[in-house]
Every structure is written in C-alpha cells, then in structure tokens.
C-alpha cells in the first residue's frame, strides 16, 4: 500500500455521515482528555461501538517517520554488532595463532584420567613367548611349473609388512626394534603361559599356545617322520621342585630362542618382603604421628616386585621447554587439586556477613566502599582458594591475582596471602600490581606519604622500594619478611622439595602481620578524608578479629602442603609457567573470614593414591626416555638419523600420555632430541639391538618382501625354474656378475660406472637389502613392466626408490596356460637376488626353556598396608602442637 505525502488531495467520494462520525470521534477524544474520570466508560464505548474509523494521511506519515527512525537506529545497532563480532572474530583468530605456540589443554577430567590410567608395565601378563619367525608350509613345483601335492616347511617372518611408497629396508629394522622394545617383558613366568600338548601321551604341557599349534600342525602333516611324531608325543614339562625350577619344551627359531633366553636371564623382578614395603612408604608419612600404619600380612617366599625406575632430571624439562613444562605442571596441578582435602565446618556465610555488617556498622553508613567488603564471600570460594593454593605450590604452577583496588578488604586479605605464599608463586606483573595497590591504598596513605609511581620493568618490587622508605619498625619488618619469603630447596629421600619458611609452618608470621596491620590502623592518614581512614581501620579490624583462626589456617595450609609433598617423586623444579592459575582476592577474603575450627588432613587412601599415580608416571617417563634413547642410537647405527628423528621424539611424547604433540613447537622438539641424544643407552636395550643387528641377513631371507640385491641387464634373461616358486626371475647366487654395493652407490652418488656397464651390454648386480614386489600375472610379464628399474638407474639416478618385480609363473598363476600350452619361454631384464629362507628342522628348533616354577609379582605394594588416622581434631604439626589451636 502506497502512503500519500503531506498536503495530498483527499478522496472526494467520502460520505457525509463518515465525516460527521469523524467529528464526533474527535469530540469524544477531547472530552476524554478534559474529563479523566469518565475515561474508562468512553473507552469501553469506543471498543464496543460499531462505527468505523478512518486514519488520516498525516497520522500515517507520523507513524512512518517514527518507524524509519527506529529502523535507522536498529540498522546502526546491527552494524555496530557486526563490527563488534568482526573484531571479536579477529581477536579469536589472533588468539588461535598465538595458541599454536602455547599448548591448550583438554578438559580437566580427561587429563586426570590419563594420569591415573598410567599403570606399571608389569601389570600386563605375558601369555606368549616373543617371536619374529614362524614355520610355514610352502608348496613344491615341478620342472614344468605345476604344483606338487607335497609341501615343505620354511621359517618365514611372522609380521612381513613393509609400508607402501619409497621405503628403505633399514626402516623396517628400526620399526622391528621399536616393536621388540614395546613387547620386551620385564619378567617371564613360563608356568603362566604353558598350555596342554594335545598329542602328548601323559597330558604334558608345552611352553605356550603357539608351540602347541606348531606341534599340532607338524603332527598332522602326512610327510612328518614317525620318529618326530613319537618325539612330539613325549614332549612335556620337567619339574625340579627342590630348586623351584621347571623346564618347558618350545619350538623356536634360533634367533627367537636367543631373544627369549635373554629375557629369561635378565628379568627385572626382585624378592619382596615386609622391609621393602615399609621402606617404599615415604619416610615422612611413616614418621607422621597422625597416620597409623599396619602391615598384617606375611609375604610368601615367592613374592616378587619390579622396582620402579625413579631416576631424576635426565631431561630437565623445566629448562627451556616452556610448552612441555606448562603441560606437566598443569596435569600435576589437576592431580593435586583432586587430592587436597575439602574444608569442613566452615563458619556460616550468612552469620559471618551479618557479624561483619555489625562490625562495620553498615546501617549507619552510606559509604559504598565498605559494602564491597562483603561481596563474593561464600564457602565455595573459600574451599576453592584453599585447594588452589596448595595444588599450585605442589605442582609449582604460577598464579595470577585478580582484584579490585577499591575493595580494601580484598587488599588486606592479599597482605595475608603475600605473607604465607612465596613471591615466586605469582607471575611478576600480577605480584607488582597487587603490591602497588596495597602500598598506594593502605600503607603510604597511613603515613601521609605521596603515591608511589612505579616504573615498569624496575628490578625492585614495590614492597622492596617501600621497605627502604618506611620508618615504622613493625611495618618495615613485615615488608622485609614478604620480600625475602622464598621456598627453601631441600633434598629429602633423593627428591628436591620446595619447603616453606619455618615461621609460616608454625604460624608465627601471622603475629608479625597483625603487628604491622595494627600499626597501620593507628596512623592518622593525614592526606585522606576521615571516611577513608575509617574504612581501612574497619577492614583491618575485621581481619584482626580472626587472628587465632588465621594462625590455624596458615598452619593447616602448611601441614597439608607438606604431607602431600611427601608423595611427590619427581624433583620440584621451580620455573614460571606459560599459563597461570587465576586467584580472586575475594576468594582469599572468603577463606580468611570463613575458616572454622575443624582440622582437615588427607586420608591415608588419598595419600597412597597420589603416591602411586606419581610413581607410575615417573617410572613410565623414565622407561619411555630409555626407549627413545635406544631408538635414536639404533637410527644412528642404521644411517636413518636425519630421516626419523622428529618422529622418534613425537612418539616419545605421545607415549607419555599427557602431551598434545601437535601443539609442541618444533624448536622444543629439536632441543628435546639434543637432550635425548646425550643420554646413555640402557644395557638391556642395547643388547637387544645388537641381537637384531647380528641377524639382519637371516631376517631378510625369511621375508617375502626383502631381497638381497637386483641384477639389471640390457638384454632379456630367461626365467629359471625354482622348486619354491616355479618359473621365476630369481638369482640364488651372483657368480659371474659384476657387483656394486647399493649402500656405496647411494652414499657416493657416482652412477658413471653402472651406466657404462649397462650401455656396454654387461649385466650388473646391485648388492644390498631392498624391497621388491611380487607379480604372478603372465600378461604383466609380457608388458615388460620391469623396464622401469633400468630407467630409474640410467635416467633418474635414483636408487632409494628402486623396487624390482619378482615374477612367479606357476600353475597357481593367472593365464599359466599361455606358458604351458605354447611352450613360451618367459624372459625379464631384471633378476631379484634372493637367498633361500631357512628350512624348518624340527630337531634344531626344539629348545628347553627354564624358569622359576612359580612366583607372584605384586604391582601395588601399598595394598598390603592398612592405614588409619587419628581424630583430625587431635592432629599435630611438626612442632608437636595441634594443627588447629583455636578451639
């Protein structure tokens, strides 16, 4: 509908009675304005009347103008919102870019679960022997390529897997070594893995299920000699009870036998007795009179345990690894928070606020600043503050303070906080801001001194500057204490601990704080109004009224911190963290004002849980370091150092469970590599690698994907008959061929010799382990796909991507009839040099393995300890006085 503009001509066909009606309506409206008492009746008449109303153009236009104004306002509002969201989005993008170098963390529950899920390795029971090889039946082929009914047994690789793409055989051995390290058992108890030999005459047992399966398959093979069958029927365990020894028969490849013999002779289990369990409990927990520990159980002589690997500071992650250190401290903080006890029987929030209101005489005052004293005080905040302080100190996590300068009560509570918590625990910017607020709001005004103008970047903190300027002994004395409040580094039971000052531990420092506060409240505040002075005095009065409770709170804080600290096994290195834990000063006020008289101490079960999680993480950390160091050494020996280094370090971090590896900056990765490279290799891991290194050729021979070399010729060579495969392009020896070492060729890059030989029509043998692929299609052989090998050498000068094709043409191949029916002699320009795998010989593969008849490995030593506490109200601190004296 189009609206008319102002002064537009009215419609001429309006009826007279309509105009009269309009006049009457106008009259009614004017009457209603004059006589308000009759407004309701006229309104009801208007609503109920049948008469129609006509709205004039002028009125329409006014409405439209209003709508336009409104819409303009709304559009401008929307535009502002769009701009705001754009700015916020840009900030988010910038934040995300920043986050790439600062690690982000998962929800707290998941980190806690990851930590608690790290269990000692011995919990995984070994059910089978370690094996690289397994015997397989392979068919035999006649001279014409047809398969015989007979089979022959060979040792083949159990996991014969090479990844696709450009691949070096040496990487296969590095992965094999990694796999051996992962599966390497800490102990082997053959009795636990032994299974029944189905073919035994007298229900004998063999060492494991795989040995039983091999025996079963050989027993059922028609070509097995009768003497072997009789031997299998006699296979059983031999027990020497007097020596607590049992011998089990096993079927193993000689290399596998060497591995398992090594594992049996180098087991990590040690005898377990009550003394070991007693000494396993942290000494400070044993000597703490608040905990009553009992060991009722007498352990059997066969009890064993695996000593946790608790070496200290081999990588020094606190030094120059900001992201890694931040992640470790965060996970430690979350774990510590979960074990700090909850405060009990806090003073009723309502009652305390009412009492504070009375002390402040708020009813008689209208000063806004004093009503702020009561904001944010609640029991939840008090409990949260208690947990945050202890957990941050246990994990050495840096804190930042959040406060409002006009809330004097927060600042006075902050004075207590700075008294009991060492300065190092706060990020410097936050510490300086808080100290400056205390000085310019409370201390300097009290003595009529001018405001402190602090220069950013000043090496001295505001309190250090103030200590030199203030003449009052008590205040200067308190400032001196705060400025020198640092952790003492003490080594206890081989672990570096960050210990609080003795004056804090026994609570005496609170008297020093109160003396300073009372001196401040007595000052005249000469440059400030009376109301200001009164507000500060009342804030100090509120805190000083709770002197006894504050002493108790300080003692309680110190006791819980030190008791839980006894359960930490890694050195407590102090270093500022990338991210911080926020602490509201109002929550500190809540803690100071609501702390009751109930003593809370960690339960023994909580302490043991905290200790176990710390031990398991620390032990796993050291074991993973040993693995990483061993693999770095192996990569170096296999000339893969440059290629694999970053992935080795990434795997190391992943296995520690708590790290988000993708967010760790590269510079820290390479620094970590340099630290790992300097560490010595553990002897067991080195011996295992030497075993693999000595037997590389045997392992290559057993693989269906690794050749020992390739022969390349300019002219085609005939496929030869082989019993194992039929017609194949395999060379079993290199007699008569000119040989070039593949490793030498890759290292020197001198291809002139090989190119000249090929162009002069002389076959050349490249000797060295390299991967190959198998093809049994006759059509692909006709297509001469193997020419690509020649092209790679002559044109591309690339040996690292060399992957020859092994052709197997026999009665199992597709289109074999082409060869058989047409007497076609297939040829190839390449031959794969492949040695025959080791034939399975039952007599040579039968080994007797010896282990203890029985022993029991206990992983949780603290399960034998029953523990209880004295009534918390009677709990005493280090000075043999009750923790909480103000009862």
UniProtKB/Swiss-Prot annotation:
Bias kind Basic and acidic residues: ranges: 9-27
Subcellular location: Virion
Molecular function in Gene Ontology: RNA binding
Marked site: Interaction with the intermediate capsid protein VP6: 231, 235, 846, 848
Primary location recorded for the protein, binned into one broad class: virion
Region Hydrophobic, annotated ranges: 401-421, 429-449
Pfam families: Rota_VP2
Protein's name according to its UniProt entry: Inner capsid protein VP2
Source organism per UniProt: Rotavirus A (isolate RVA/Monkey/United States/TUCH/2003/G3P[24])
Source lineage: Viruses, Riboviria, Orthornavirae, Duplornaviricota, Resentoviricetes
